Amino acid sequence: MPSLKDLKNRIASVKATQKITKAMKMVAAAKLRRAQEAAEAARPYSQRMAAVLSNIAQAVGADDSAPRLMTGTGKDDTHLLVVCTAERGLCGGFNSQIARHARDHVRKLLAQGKTVKIICVGKKGFDILRREFASLIIDRVDLREVKKIGFENADRIGHKVIELFDNGEFDVCTLFYSEFKSVISQIPTAQQLIPASAGEAVAEGASAIYEYEPDAAAILSDLIPRNISVQIFRALLENVAGEMGAKMSAMDNATRNAGEMINKLTLNYNRQRQAQITKELIEIISGAEAL
């Protein structure tokens, strides 16, 4: 049984931890608001760009003028996975959910005899995936020193992916991230970047007829690389919002658990103190009677 001094020290230690978790919750809540606004602002642009890309791709079709980023290599042998997670922890299962989603996909591809390569964006995903797939990781993007995610960060990743594709390093590229829904809901998501899927053309009204200058294929050649960077940018923003939401929820739970632990330790402390006082009183009374 711990002594009164030990219990007192433990109570003080838990109270200090509770102050830290409460402060971290408040910081995460403040950052969440800004991150959520940024993620929600990026969604319409990325969705609209994907829609425009789809319409132009439908016009081009699969003829010889279509860019390779849209048509692909014609093979499905080598897959590149871009896995986006957070640089830091203390956000519940946020990072492990994304990494688990990517890991299951890797296992599935390997079981089919495919070659897999991984680019890790964020330290936590790298730490998780390298335990099983260290030999498959070809690059790691470090964003620890980036205070605010900007388009230039996503653009560098996008250029790296396109460079690898142009060099014949892979056939299919899939982006993994967590789509932010709410503070308590972040959904691990996989999105194919290359080949850029034409999808279904989005109707622009009854007379949606366009002429493309210089031509649709040339526009696609410029648009697809930008779309890749835009989709990565959106994924990074969604991740930041999801990370802050998960961190706020985790720190709220930690603060509440610390409060419950303090109550239990305080109750135990008071019981032991009461028992010690009672014992001392009995000893005093017994000594007085002996006299």
Curated annotation (Swiss-Prot):
The keyword Ion transport is assigned to this record: yes
Keyword Cell membrane annotated: yes
InterPro entries noted in UniProt: ATP_synth_F1_ATPase_gsu (IPR035968), ATP_synth_F1_gsu (IPR000131), ATP_synth_F1_gsu_CS (IPR023632)
Biological process (GO), any one: proton motive force-driven plasma membrane ATP synthesis
Keywords: ATP synthesis, Cell inner membrane, Cell membrane, CF(1), Hydrogen ion transport, Ion transport, Membrane, Transport
Topology of the protein relative to the lipid bilayer: Peripheral membrane protein
Subcellular localization: Cell inner membrane
Record's GO cellular component terms: plasma membrane; proton-transporting ATP synthase complex
CDD domains xref list: F1-ATPase_gamma
Signal sequence region: none
Domain of life: Bacteria
MF terms in GO: ATP binding; proton-transporting ATP synthase activity, rotational mechanism
Entry function: Produces ATP from ADP in the presence of a proton gradient across the membrane. The gamma chain is believed to be important in regulating ATPase activity and the flow of protons through the CF(0) complex.
PANTHER family with a match to the protein in the record: ATP SYNTHASE GAMMA CHAIN (PTHR11693), ATP SYNTHASE SUBUNIT GAMMA, MITOCHONDRIAL (PTHR11693:SF22)
Self-association state and partner proteins as the record states: F-type ATPases have 2 components, CF(1) - the catalytic core - and CF(0) - the membrane proton channel. CF(1) has five subunits: alpha(3), beta(3), gamma(1), delta(1), epsilon(1). CF(0) has three main subunits: a, b and c.
NCBIfam families xref list: ATPsyn_F1gamma, PRK05621.1-4
Similarity comment: family membership: Belongs to the ATPase gamma chain family.
Protein name in UniProt: ATP synthase gamma chain
Native source organism of the sequence: Sinorhizobium medicae (strain WSM419)
Gene: atpG
